[in-house]
A protein has these predicted regions:
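A short-motif feature that recognizes glycine-rich, charge-decorated loops
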Residues: 1-346
Length: 346
C-alpha cells in the first residue's frame, strides 16, 4: 500500500512539473531573469551623444535631434531651438530606468507588447536610436503597462523583452521636441490693440483700469472677458507648428502696443491646418524713453533699459524672420473675433 502511495505521489509531482513547464512556455518562453539598466551602457554615454532618432513603422524616421554646441536642435526644424530642458530630462530618465520584470523572448509574441521590429510595416512601437560616444544604441519602446505603469522595451537585435520602471513613450511629432515658446508680452504692459478684421471696419481695444474696452463704444457695452482675451493673446503665446514663410496674404491684423514702446504685429490667416500667423516686432524708442522718465529716480538707468529692450526686440525678431507659425486653437479663436463679438448686445 505504501509503495502504491509513493508511486501515485511521484506521478502527481511529474504532472505538476509538466504543467508548470507548459505554463511557462505559454507566457512566452524562458526569458532571462537578470535585471539592470533598461538600455545597458546608456547612462555613461549621455554626455557624448551626438544624435538621437525616433523611428516608427517601416523604419521611418519620425524625429531626429542633433547636438549643436551645448544644446540640441530638431533636424526637421533647423534654426529653431529645441526644448533643451525636456530633452535633457528624457535622456536622464532613460539613463535611470531599470528593468523590473522579464517578459517574452519569443519574436512571434513581441507584437503583443508593441516591441516588434520597427522595420515591419505594421509595427506599433517606436525605436530610439542613439549615436555618439561608441556603437549605436537602439531600444524598441512598446506599450505601457495598464496597471503598473512603465513601458515594455526590447534592446534591438535581442529577443528578450522587459517591463521597465519608467514611462518612455517618445513623442512622434517633431514639434513636440521644440521650444514652443513663441513670445511672451505680459498683459500688464499692453495699452492698446489695433485690429483690422477679415471683414468690417477696423477698431481698437484700449486699456481702461484693469481691463480693456472697445474704443468709441458706449460705456458698459464692452465684454470684459473677450476684450481681455484678445489683448492677452501675446502673453505666453506658444506655437503648435512652424514652417517657412510662403508669403501667404494675411486676412486680419492685430497690432499690440505696449506702454514702453513695443509694437507687435500679428498678421493671420486660416487654412485646413488651422490659424497661421506672421509676427514682427518693433520698438518706438521715443515712447520707451518717455515711459522710463515716469519710472522714478530709483529705477534702472534709461540707457540700460533701452538697451535691454533693443536686445529683446532683436532676439524675438530674429526668431520670427522668414517663418510662419501655427497657433493653438484656444488662442487663435481670439484673432477671429469681430468687433461685434467684443460688445454686449444692444
Amino acid at each position: 500500500m505504501r509503495t502504491r502511495s509513493l508511486l501515485l505521489m511521484a506521478v502527481v509531482a511529474l504532472g505538476l512539473a509538466a504543467l508548470a513547464a507548459w505554463a511557462l512556455v505559454q507566457r512566452g518562453g524562458s526569458a532571462p531573469a537578470s535585471t539592470g539598466e533598461a538600455l545597458p551602457g546608456f547612462a555613461d554615454r549621455i554626455e557624448t551623444l551626438e544624435r538621437v532618432e525616433v523611428r516608427g513603422a517601416g523604419d521611418g524616421l519620425l524625429v531626429s535631434l542633433m547636438r549643436r554646441g551645448d544644446g540640441w536642435e530638431v533636424e526637421q526644424y533647423p534654426g529653431w531651438p529645441a526644448n533643451q530642458r525636456e530633452i535633457s530630462r528624457a535622456l536622464f530618465r532613460l539613463g535611470e530606468a531599470r528593468r523590473i520584470e522579464a517578459k517574452t523572448d519569443k519574436p512571434a509574441l513581441h507584437a503583443r507588447l508593441g516591441v516588434e521590429d520597427v522595420g515591419q510595416a505594421e509595427a506599433k512601437g517606436t525605436e530610439l536610436r542613439f549615436e555618439g560616444g561608441g556603437d549605436t544604441l537602439r531600444l524598441v519602446v512598446g506599450r505601457n503597462h495598464p496597471g503598473l505603469g512603465g513601458s515594455y522595451v526590447r534592446v534591438a537585435d535581442e529577443d528578450a523583452s522587459w517591463l521597465i520602471d519608467a514611462d518612455l513613450s517618445p513623442a512622434r511629432d517633431p514639434v513636440a521636441w521644440l521650444d514652443r515658446r513663441l513670445v511672451d508680452l505680459p498683459l500688464a504692459r499692453t495699452e492698446r490693440v489695433r485690429i483690422q478684421p477679415a471683414s468690417g471696419r477696423a477698431f481698437s481695444l484700449v486699456r481702461s483700469g484693469e481691463g480693456f474696452v472697445v474704443q468709441g463704444a458706449p460705456a458698459g457695452r464692452s465684454l470684459d472677458a473677450q476684450t481681455t482675451a484678445t489683448a492677452a493673446l501675446p502673453e505666453q503665446l506658444a506655437l503648435d507648428g512652424l514652417a517657412p514663410d510662403d508669403g501667404q496674404e494675411a486676412s486680419r491684423r492685430h497690432v499690440y502696443e505696449t506702454v514702453d514702446g513695443l509694437r507687435l504685429e500679428v498678421a493671420s490667416w486660416q487654412d485646413e491646418a488651422g490659424t497661421w500667423a506672421r509676427l514682427s516686432l518693433a520698438l518706438d524708442e521715443d515712447v520707451a524713453t518717455a515711459w522710463f522718465k515716469q519710472a522714478g529716480e530709483d529705477a534702472e538707468p534709461e540707457a540700460e533699459r533701452l538697451q535691454r529692450l533693443r536686445a529683446q526686440v532683436a532676439g524675438w525678431q530674429g526668431r520670427f524672420e522668414g517663418r510662419r507659425f501655427l497657433l493653438p486653437p484656444h488662442k487663435a479663436a481670439n484673432l477671429l473675433a469681430s468687433r461685434a463679438e467684443h460688445l454686449a448686445p444692444d
